[in-house]
Design a protein with these regions (language model features):
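Hydrophobic-ligand binding "helix-grip"
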Residues: 73-126, 134-136
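Hydrophobic ligand-binding cavity/cleft-lining segments
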Residues: 1-61
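A conserved amphipathic terminal alpha-helix motif
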Residues: 128-130, 134-173
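Short Pro/Gly-enriched beta-strand edge/turn motifs at strand-loop
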Residues: 4-6, 63-66, 96-104
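Hydrophobic pocket/interface hotspot
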Residues: 32-37, 43, 70, 83, ...
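Short structured motifs
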Residues: 6, 18-20, 66-68, 114-116
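Short beta-edge strand/loop motif at the mouth of beta-sheet-based domains
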Residues: 21, 41-82, 86-92
């Protein structure tokens, strides 16, 4: 099975916090689910933890792509982000979308994260969807002590919402 590609500074186990959620779904493909992540303007419709998504330099509702800069609020944090990896899935290749997100601040308040998603077609008509986030900073260390379980539940809800929309073939515009 495939794994998230980690820049060295975000290698899990060496950061202040790490969260991982995963699901396997029969009857869908990576190609069918992936657009529900790349169309970030609809996240709030299937995941209560995300809101106020704004893609830099666009008045329309474009898709996330390599190099896209955007901002959003996730579970109360105003995050600035840039897509650092983007690979559309195909029958023989997993889809990948990762961004570096940060909350500006000083050494006590700055928060950096690498959030990666992987969409992998599996045997027997299944898709594996993995999301992982590796976090750096004092706020991340505090989250690890007090709220890691809530992050896990939130990320699982994000995956479940994506799958639900893909099953229902919800329009993306």
């Amino acid at each position: 099975m495939e794994a998230i590609h980690w820049p060295k500074e975000f290698t899990p186990g060496f950061t202040d916090n790490f969260v991982s959620a995963e699901t396997y779904v029969a009857g869908l493909t990576a190609e069918e689910v992936f657009p529900y992540l790349t169309h970030a303007h609809i996240w709030h419709e299937y995941y209560d933890g995300a809101s106020d998504v704004k893609l830099s330099g666009s008045d329309e509702k474009p898709e996330l792509k390599e190099g896209t800069k955007f901002s959003f609020n996730i579970i109360g944090w105003d995050v600035t982000a840039e897509v650092v990896e983007f690979v559309e899935p195909s029958k023989d290749r997993p889809g990948r979308l990762s961004w570096h997100g940060w909350v500006p601040g000083d050494e006590n308040t700055r928060f950096d994260a690498l959030h990666g998603f992987l969409f992998e077609n599996m045997p027997d008509g299944r898709v594996r969807i993995l999301t992982q986030e590796s976090e750096i900073g004092k706020p991340a260390a505090e989250l690890a002590k007090t709220h890691s379980a809530s992050l896990l539940v939130g990320f699982q809800a994000w995956l479940d919402g994506m799958v639900d929309f893909a099953r229902k073939k919800i329009r993306l515009d």
